[in-house]
């Protein structure tokens, strides 16, 4: 492939990576990871509510990795509330999983910025077969994509398996019990998904620029070495 086309491809990949890093940094600070609807089970059972009557007992909340807000309803009007995970909810949430989500998100940001630098260096510098060359690009893209995947898996497990929304809704609620009715991933979660997809796309762009996948190259080299041994 001509040098000019390689520069364009690497520049595109660098811009994509930089946009991903900015997106994930923004996503970390927003309460837009998930939106949940919760039912005041105690109140609904007391009055035997059904159908449209349940709307009076439906609350909702949205939250991210650090803070969130919502409205509780138990038949007596809306009660807005705000919360933060640190330090308010430390005793109510699976702390190890939550901290790992934040940690892998930060690693994702750092590696994505490193990937941006690598792509720009390969576009305008003179890279060789070293860590900052094609091997480095594949390595950073793979690790970054893996971190993005881990963030999504861990967050989904915290929400679904550990019932994070229910724990938040029932936090410091001695009288009423709340049950999750519906949960939807929102903007920030999908930003991480897009970032994961972009790192996969960057791997394809590296291949499009004419650089073999590392494992493919190793197989070809091994085949050549075996052929040479047979000849001699």
From Swiss-Prot:
<dbReference type="GO" id="GO:0015630">
    <property type="term" value="C:microtubule cytoskeleton"/>
</dbReference>
<dbReference type="GO" id="GO:0050885">
    <property type="term" value="P:neuromuscular process controlling balance"/>
</dbReference>
<feature type="transmembrane region" description="Helical">
    <location>
        <begin position="135"/>
        <end position="155"/>
    </location>
</feature>
<feature type="glycosylation site" description="N-linked (GlcNAc...) asparagine">
    <location>
        <position position="48"/>
    </location>
</feature>
<dbReference type="GO" id="GO:0007601">
    <property type="term" value="P:visual perception"/>
</dbReference>
<keyword id="KW-1133">Transmembrane helix</keyword>
<keyword id="KW-0812">Transmembrane</keyword>
<dbReference type="GO" id="GO:0060088">
    <property type="term" value="P:auditory receptor cell stereocilium organization"/>
</dbReference>
<comment type="function">
    <text>May have a role in the excitatory ribbon synapse junctions between hair cells and cochlear ganglion cells and presumably also in analogous synapses within the retina.</text>
</comment>
<dbReference type="GO" id="GO:0060117">
    <property type="term" value="P:auditory receptor cell development"/>
</dbReference>
<feature type="transmembrane region" description="Helical">
    <location>
        <begin position="186"/>
        <end position="206"/>
    </location>
</feature>
<dbReference type="GO" id="GO:0007605">
    <property type="term" value="P:sensory perception of sound"/>
</dbReference>
<dbReference type="GO" id="GO:0048870">
    <property type="term" value="P:cell motility"/>
</dbReference>
<keyword id="KW-0844">Vision</keyword>
<keyword id="KW-0716">Sensory transduction</keyword>
<dbReference type="GO" id="GO:0050957">
    <property type="term" value="P:equilibrioception"/>
</dbReference>
<dbReference type="GO" id="GO:0032420">
    <property type="term" value="C:stereocilium"/>
</dbReference>
<keyword id="KW-1003">Cell membrane</keyword>
<protein>
    <recommendedName>
        <fullName>Clarin-1</fullName>
    </recommendedName>
</protein>
<dbReference type="InterPro" id="IPR026748">
    <property type="entry name" value="Clarin"/>
</dbReference>
<keyword id="KW-1009">Hearing</keyword>
<feature type="glycosylation site" description="N-linked (GlcNAc...) asparagine">
    <location>
        <position position="184"/>
    </location>
</feature>
<dbReference type="GO" id="GO:0030027">
    <property type="term" value="C:lamellipodium"/>
</dbReference>
<dbReference type="GO" id="GO:0007015">
    <property type="term" value="P:actin filament organization"/>
</dbReference>
<keyword id="KW-0325">Glycoprotein</keyword>
<dbReference type="GO" id="GO:0045178">
    <property type="term" value="C:basal part of cell"/>
</dbReference>
<dbReference type="GO" id="GO:0005886">
    <property type="term" value="C:plasma membrane"/>
</dbReference>
<feature type="transmembrane region" description="Helical">
    <location>
        <begin position="101"/>
        <end position="121"/>
    </location>
</feature>
<dbReference type="GO" id="GO:0045494">
    <property type="term" value="P:photoreceptor cell maintenance"/>
</dbReference>
<feature type="transmembrane region" description="Helical">
    <location>
        <begin position="8"/>
        <end position="28"/>
    </location>
</feature>
<dbReference type="GO" id="GO:0010592">
    <property type="term" value="P:positive regulation of lamellipodium assembly"/>
</dbReference>
<dbReference type="GO" id="GO:0030140">
    <property type="term" value="C:trans-Golgi network transport vesicle"/>
</dbReference>
<dbReference type="GO" id="GO:0005902">
    <property type="term" value="C:microvillus"/>
</dbReference>
<comment type="similarity">
    <text>Belongs to the clarin family.</text>
</comment>
<dbReference type="GO" id="GO:0050953">
    <property type="term" value="P:sensory perception of light stimulus"/>
</dbReference>
<keyword id="KW-0472">Membrane</keyword>
């Amino acid at each position: 492939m001509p040098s000019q086309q390689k520069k364009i491809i690497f520049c595109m990949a660098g811009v994509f990576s930089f946009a991903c890093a900015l997106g994930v940094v923004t996503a970390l600070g927003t309460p837009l990871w998930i939106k949940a609807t919760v039912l005041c089970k105690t109140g609904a059972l007391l009055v035997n509510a059904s159908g449209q009557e349940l709307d009076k007992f439906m609350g909702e909340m949205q939250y991210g990795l650090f803070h969130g807000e919502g409205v509780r309803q138990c038949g007596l009007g809306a009660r807005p509330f705000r919360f933060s995970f640190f330090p308010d909810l430390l005793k109510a949430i699976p702390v190890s999983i939550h901290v790992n989500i934040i940690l892998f998100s930060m690693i994702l940001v750092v590696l994505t910025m490193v990937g941006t630098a690598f792509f720009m260096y390969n576009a305008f510098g003179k890279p060789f077969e070293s860590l900052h060359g094609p091997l480095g690009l594949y390595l950073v893209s793979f690790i970054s994509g893996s971190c993005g995947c881990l963030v999504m898996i861990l967050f989904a497990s915290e929400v679904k398996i550990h019932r994070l929304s229910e724990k938040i809704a029932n936090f410091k609620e001695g009288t009423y019990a709340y049950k999750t009715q519906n949960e939807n991933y929102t903007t920030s979660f999908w930003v991480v998904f897009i970032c994961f997809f972009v790192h996969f796309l960057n791997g394809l762009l590296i291949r499009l620029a004419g650089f073999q996948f590392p494992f493919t190259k190793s197989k070809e080299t091994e085949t050549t070495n075996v052929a040479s041994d047979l000849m001699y």
